[in-house]
């Protein structure tokens, strides 16, 4: 139901086959496995689903004192342990795990909560992994803070650097998975515009209802009384330790059309060098993407465009934030127009996702939506233009002629004479005959 009270749809578990196989392989090897990904991407459901199928111990960490954290973990798993002695600290807890007679799998979800309370825990774990972890046992540490997980496991000076047999990143799911999970017709433009509002985050999909259009979905998720998404950007930034007004202000500027660092700085009334650190932090947190023209290196090119990665967060800053005060006064046609414009940017991303190594290219007043190695000609390029509408044959031919003419005027054309051209439109959203969802 809409108007402030919303039903949360129970979704099918879909499209995590690759992650399931990685978890199976990790269980066979034993050791340490790191699972990370932004909040609400589906890490916990994936891990619980996998452990329901194969068995194991699972506990989600609390944000509380160390004694309470250890007590909660022990309470969650004590029925599966061969002891009833309660641990008084981390050393006791790790010793209990080491004394178990049978191989085990233990997942500690929201691991950064534990290290935030006890910064010595990674060093304790390092010693235990090196000397006390029994053969055939698997410890899974999962977390939502991309920056903190990077600092804990990928920084060369971190105690746990190099200790994991695998780092498994759980990413957003794609359009096909969205259609499967929500039981929607994939070729329809209306379905893709719903996807553009929620992106690949399964938690947001729970607000999708059959028979409701993209405007209904946007109002339920963003514009109704106390909407679910109202504080979402702040929650994500808080997870990443990005406090203060500057990260939000940067995202506001990008959402409203500032794509270059100089443009963002101008919107914020500051100099570009003052934003270098926060721009890098937002990239590290997988909130912003930094795009270079196709074929150029980050070490030599100064031409950069920034974009908000997640479609739902992009919608927040490009549609919700600028229009929330007046949204209720807009006629349905204007609301649909705003959503359509946002969906066009997501469709452009979707087109590039069809080709490995695809990117954008731009110079002066020329821009191409897609440039990549041509899968049909290893020595050539595929150059594409995306249009978020169903083009007629005449419209398609007109866009194709304009694309070829634009290519002939760009510097990249002289270095790549073998180019093939393609125009993408809404007709390209087709059902891929996917496998049935896991019940």
Segments predicted by a language model, with ranges:
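Conserved lysine of the Walker
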Residues: 43
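Conserved NTP-binding/hydrolysis module of P-loop NTPases
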Residues: 55-59, 64-85, 98
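Sensor-1/coupling segment of RecA-like P-loop NTPase cores
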Residues: 33-34, 117, 128-157
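Accessory nucleic acid-recognition modules appended to NTPase machines
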Residues: 204, 210, 217-368
């Amino acid at each position: 139901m809409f108007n402030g009270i919303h039903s949360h749809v129970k979704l099918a578990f879909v499209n995590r086959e690759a992650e399931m196989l990685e978890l199976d392989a990790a269980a066979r090897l034993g050791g340490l496995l790191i699972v990370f990904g932004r909040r609400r991407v589906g890490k916990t459901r994936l891990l619980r689903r996998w452990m329901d199928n194969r068995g194991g111990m699972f506990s989600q960490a609390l944000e509380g004192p160390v004694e309470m954290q250890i007590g909660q973990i022990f309470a969650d798993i004590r029925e599966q342990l061969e002891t009833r002695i309660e641990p008084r600290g981390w050393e006791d807890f790790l010793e209990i795990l080491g004394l178990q007679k049978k191989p085990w799998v233990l997942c500690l979800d929201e691991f950064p909560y534990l290290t935030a309370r006890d910064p010595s825990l990674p060093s304790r774990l390092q010693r235990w992994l090196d000397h006390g972890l029994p053969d055939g046992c698997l410890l899974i540490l999962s977390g939502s803070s991309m920056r903190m997980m990077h600092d804990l496991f990928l920084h060369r000076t971190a105690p746990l650097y190099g200790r994991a047999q695998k780092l498994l990143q759980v990413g957003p799911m794609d359009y096909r998975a969205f259609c499967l999970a929500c039981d929607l017709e994939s070729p329809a433009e209306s379905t893709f515009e719903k996807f553009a509002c929620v992106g690949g985050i399964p938690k947001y999909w729970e607000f999708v209802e059959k028979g409701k259009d993209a405007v209904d979905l946007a109002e339920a998720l963003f514009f109704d009384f106390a909407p679910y998404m109202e504080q979402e950007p702040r929650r994500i930034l808080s997870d990443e330790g990005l406090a203060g007004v500057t990260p939000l202000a940067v995202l506001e500027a990008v959402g409203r059309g500032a794509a270059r660092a100089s443009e963002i700085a101008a919107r914020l009334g500051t100099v570009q060098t003052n934003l270098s650190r926060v721009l890098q932090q937002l990239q590290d947190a997988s909130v912003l993407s930094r795009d270079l023209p196709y074929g150029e290196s980050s070490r030599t090119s100064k031409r950069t465009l920034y974009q908000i990665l997640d479609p739902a967060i992009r919608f927040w800053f490009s549609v919700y934030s600028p229009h929330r005060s007046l949204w209720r006064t807009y006629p349905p046609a204007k609301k649909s127009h705003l959503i359509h414009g946002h969906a066009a940017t997501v469709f452009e991303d979707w087109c590039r996702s069809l080709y490995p190594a695809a990117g954008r290219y731009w110079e002066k007043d020329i821009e191409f939506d897609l440039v990549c190695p041509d899968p049909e000609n290893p020595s050539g390029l595929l150059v594409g233009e995306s249009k978020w509408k169903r083009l007629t044959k005449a419209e398609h031919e007109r866009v194709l002629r304009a694309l070829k003419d634009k290519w002939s005027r760009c510097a990249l054309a002289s270095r790549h004479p073998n180019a093939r051209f393609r125009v993408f439109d809404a007709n390209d959203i087709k059902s891929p005959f996917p496998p049935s969802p896991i019940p």
